[in-house]
Amino acid sequence: MDLTLLLHSFTPSWTSVAMLLGYFTYLAIFGSILPGKVVPGATLSDGTRLYYRCNGLLLLFLLVILLGIGGWMDLLSPTAIADRGLELLSATLVFSALVTNVLYIVGCKSHDQSSSLRPHTTGNLIEDWWFGIQLNPQFMGLDLKFYFVRAGMLGWLLINLSVLVKSIQESNLSQSMILYQLFCVIYIMDYFIHEEYMTSTWDIIAERLGFMLVFGDIVWIPFTFSIQGWWLLRNKVELTIAAIIANCLVFFMGYLVFRGANKQKHVFKKNPKALIWGRPPKVIGGKLLASGYWPFSGASQGTVTISGTCW
């Protein structure tokens, strides 16, 4: 590809910027008003805790329906994301940097002494910008950390669906594309069905919100996790029946281990005395779970990693 053409493809247009801002606005507004299970987060060092409205699945369904209606009425193109993928990538990257700058400035100026908003600085500008200043910064009552990871997961689905439609329009739909889309939909739907599990993850509990998390959530997740779909759009790969069965078996084996292990971890963090496989949990160092799937975590993680090759 010509370098000039490549650079032009990465240059955000006003359309791509509007698409991005519209998407984030939708998540902010409807994420605040749609009903959902309110889940308490971990108890922080000052004894306080945040509460999270887990309505991501409803947000997903509503957005897909709205986009479907918009496409049916010719108000928008279902391939708009696939057509402007590089533009949206660069626009989101710039957006993540701008958000991080605001978080850094606001965090440094904060005099709040609560666990969520107390500034944590090292004196190293790059380190503080990268790892963040505040644990749980908010904007107009919106918990930004929870918001961004939701945006990344849902954005991944939207990219995939747009690529799928483009593949159909170009008569380039393959068994590999169908399997990839199916596996991703299962994983993403599972995430939102069990969205409350996110409240007990290290990212939410302990990581401050800086460029590492902002970039990871809204750039890395949607744009790198969808690489397989982009590749299959231009490279039609047909599979034998045996290959399809093998891919499905490995995927579902990895998925079941992943889901079971993460459920055990979530239950343990919420209640350290909860039974794991009918037995009291074994713990290493007071915090590390060594029951259920977790004594075999190395093998389990390896299986899950191998299952990722099926995508």
Predicted regions and their residues:
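Membrane-anchoring alpha-helices and their flanking helix-loop junctions
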Residues: 1-294, 298, 304-310
